[in-house]
Amino acid sequence: QNFRYIGLIATALPEAKIIHVKRDPAAVCWANYKTFFPSEGLGYCFSIEDTIHYVRLYEDLMEFWGSELSNKIHTLNYEQLTVNQEKETKRLIDYIGLDWHEACLSPQDNKRGVSTASSIQVRQKVYQGSSQKWKKYEPFLNGAFDQFL
C-alpha cells in the first residue's frame, strides 16, 4: 500500500527511486480477495466489488503519479518479468544503480526472512501463469472481472 504515499515519499526523499510493479488487474484483485489480511486498512479484500474498486483507485493514482513523477518511477511489468526475467531484472538493477550479479536471477535462493502474505511464493522461482489463476473461478465471479478483459 506504499503507493498511497508516493507524493510524500517524493517530497521527503527527493532522491528516492520508486519501483512500481504493474500486474494484470484481474490477477491483483483475485490475489487480494482470496488472501486473508488481518491488518487494518485491508478490509476491502473481503468484498470482490470493494477489491475491484480499490484496484481501480490504485491504477488511477499510479497513472497520475506516473505522469507527474515519470523520472522517479520505474514501472516493472510483472507478466513481462515472468516471460523475460533476465532482461527485466537487469533493467531494474540498472535503474536503482546497483551492480549486476547472477544471483539476481535466483531470488528464491535468498534465505533472508520476509513478512508477506506470499512468503511461500517468494521462495519459488519466478514462473509464468500465476496471473491467470483467477480464470478457473471465472464462472463463479458473475462477470466481475469482465471490465479487465
Task: Describe each model-derived feature in a short phrase.
Residues 1-15, 67:
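Flexible, glycine/threonine-enriched loop-and-boundary segments that flank and lead into catalytic domains
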